[in-house]
């Protein structure tokens, strides 16, 4: 089994990411082997598929444009005030729902900013947003089993094992690392679902069609490094260094933050937000002729449809994991 040229099936690498092949109706195709395959390489079997979610919900606290980099590779605090101009600031947080437009882009509701934005007559080289590290996905996904004899439907969770060719998110919470246990009060004291192939530990349900359990599933980004076991046991990697993104517009980085939105998180429990920074590929030049500043959200690959195998070797959908949304800043 492979998930990319020369890569082991369960290897955590860039070659193991990306979308899966779908049919004309958008259903993920299950190959004769009983597994989905890569959208570009039919010989590359996958245990997850990066797809475009139907709905993506996030709480935003701050947004700004900067004349120098707000991201730091070290230090206990972030500084996005000295060299940045805020275009959005809401201490309580504003819940934004992003709706897939069918091409990887999204519309935001409500609008992030009401009214005019006052920016300096400057050249901005960086941008940032501060958001909750609780990312929510509401998504349904169909599967095409016509090319395999291994099974006729996907297994999922709920009150008991569910089966069908359509699977959807339900109101449960998981972490990026699929940790076990219960969070502390900073994260709502919620029970975490590990996605181990049992009904109780799944954040999804399957059937012939979506039912009344269809809801937002929550994914907590608790660390940017490796973690295992129970919540709070593993140490936290609070920084994700700059790397390219599918939406373009520059390289992106992130830092986990405490509730004051300035101190770098040191534990899973005190890490409740994250700063998303962009090193702009083309600096934004704001002058007297600038009439428009826009923020675009990209959802391509922002839901990770994750699978495992049950003891009887049935393919089981464990969760629709939320990956950080892509953000593009433009001015004209």
Q: Predicted regions: what is each one?
A:
Residues 2-8, 13-332:
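A short, solvent-exposed, low-complexity linear motif enriched for acidic/polar residues
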């Amino acid at each position: 089994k492979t998930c990319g040229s020369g890569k082991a099936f369960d290897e955590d690498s860039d070659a193991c990411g990306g979308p899966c092949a779908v049919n004309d109706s958008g259903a993920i195709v299950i190959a004769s082997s009983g597994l989905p395959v890569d959208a570009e390489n039919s010989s590359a079997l996958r245990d997850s598929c990066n797809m475009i979610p139907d709905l993506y919900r996030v709480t935003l606290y701050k947004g700004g444009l900067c004349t120098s980099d707000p991201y730091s590779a070290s230090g206990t605090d972030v500084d996005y005030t000295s060299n940045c101009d805020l275009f959005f600031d809401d201490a309580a947080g504003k819940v934004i729902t992003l709706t897939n437009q069918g091409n990887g882009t999204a519309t935001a509701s409500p609008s992030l900013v009401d009214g005019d934005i006052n920016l300096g007559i400057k050249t901005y080289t960086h941008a940032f947003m501060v958001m909750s590290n609780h990312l929510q996905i509401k998504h349904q996904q169909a599967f095409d089993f016509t090319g395999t004899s291994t099974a006729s439907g996907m297994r999922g969770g709920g009150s008991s094992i569910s089966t069908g060719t359509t699977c959807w998110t339900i109101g449960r919470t998981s972490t990026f690392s699929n940790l076990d246990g219960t969070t502390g009060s900073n994260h709502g004291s919620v029970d975490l679902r590990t996605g181990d192939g049992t009904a109780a530990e799944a954040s999804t349900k399957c059937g012939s069609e979506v039912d009344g359990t269809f809801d937002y599933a929550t994914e907590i980004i608790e660390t940017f490094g490796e973690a295992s076991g129970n919540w709070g046991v593993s140490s936290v990697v609070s920084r994700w260094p700059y790397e390219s993104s599918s939406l373009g517009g520059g390289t992106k980085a992130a830092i986990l933050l405490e509730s004051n939105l300035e101190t770098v998180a040191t534990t899973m429990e005190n890490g409740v937000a994250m700063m998303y920074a962009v090193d702009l590929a083309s600096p934004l030049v704001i002058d007297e002729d600038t009439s428009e500043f826009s923020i675009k959200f990209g959802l391509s690959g922002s839901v990770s449809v994750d699978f495992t195998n049950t003891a009887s070797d049935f393919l089981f959908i464990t969760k629709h994991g939320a990956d950080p949304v892509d953000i593009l800043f433009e001015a004209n």
